[in-house]
């Protein structure tokens, strides 16, 4: 499932912030905040969608449950999301615990080929002991686990790995994102431009002033009508996308148009109806 990528990403982020130890609870909170925008804004399924319509991915279920419990918007900040998780921690507890069953242990599986000892994946206590033994006798692992249970279980980052991760954080996170995008695109083939839908785009990158200036010059020489109302554009107006930005993920000129400011917010991210709006759009 996709949350293995979010598990690794959360650990790298915590280490880059100077953390030397954490807990399952803290790491999973970080995972929820990292997955929040994609799931909420674009309805991306982290591990595909089965025929029965049930959500397979535990991390996606956690995001959707927090959505039901809170009133947070899709572009809520990490601080806001973590505050909401804390507020509804009791209600989220069972869903969060499900994320601890396999991934924290399986994420280290690649290292265990160095040992001939058989790994018992069915017992958290035995896996914890095996990880500690392997780390001591065979090879230093990125992290080992403490003896507490469930969400309270400690995660101790190893010093040899901390320095390497801090020195190469950007490259490691870039690799994780690359692998994450490949996984998500395979599971969401109907979603275009998925690489641009993992985190909110900074508004300062999307400045539309020059587009507004161009439309203003056009309106000085010919009449432009609002695509949705058919009324001449006069007074206050917004510049917005005919096909919502969340679908095309760009600000190309062909898709930008003046629009009645009072209608812009109500249009939201819904696709406009082909008839009669496309004809109006083309005539402008």
Question: Model-flagged regions — what are they?
Answer:
Residues 1-207, 211, 276-284:
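Mixed-charge, low-complexity interaction segments
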């Amino acid at each position: 499932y996709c949350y293995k990528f979010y598990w690794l990403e959360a650990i790298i982020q915590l280490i880059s912030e100077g953390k030397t130890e954490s807990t399952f609870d803290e790491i999973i909170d970080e995972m929820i905040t990292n997955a929040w925008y994609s799931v909420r804004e674009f309805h991306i399924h982290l591990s595909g969608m089965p025929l029965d319509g049930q959500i397979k991915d535990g991390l996606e279920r956690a995001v959707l449950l927090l959505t039901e419990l809170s009133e947070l918007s899709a572009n809520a900040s990490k601080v806001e999301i973590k505050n909401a998780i804390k507020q509804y921690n009791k209600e989220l507890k069972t869903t969060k615990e499900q994320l601890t069953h396999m991934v924290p242990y399986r994420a280290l599986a690649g290292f265990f080929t160095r040992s001939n000892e058989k790994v018992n994946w069915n017992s958290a206590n035995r896996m914890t002991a095996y990880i500690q033994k392997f780390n001591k006798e065979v090879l230093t692992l990125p992290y080992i686990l403490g003896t507490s249970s469930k969400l309270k279980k400690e995660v101790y980052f190893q010093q040899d790995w901390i320095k390497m991760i801090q020195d190469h954080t950007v490259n490691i996170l870039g690799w994780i994102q690359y692998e994450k995008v490949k996984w998500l695109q395979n599971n969401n083939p109907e979603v275009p431009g998925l690489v641009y839908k993992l985190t909110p785009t900074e508004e300062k990158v999307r400045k539309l002033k020059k587009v507004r200036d161009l439309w203003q010059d056009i309106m000085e020489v010919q009449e432009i009508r609002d695509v949705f109302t058919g009324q001449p554009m006069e007074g206050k107006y917004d510049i917005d996308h005919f096909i919502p930005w969340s679908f095309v993920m760009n600000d190309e000129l062909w898709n930008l148009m003046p629009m009645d400011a009072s209608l812009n917010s109500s249009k939201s991210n819904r696709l406009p109806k082909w008839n009669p709006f496309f004809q109006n759009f083309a005539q402008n």
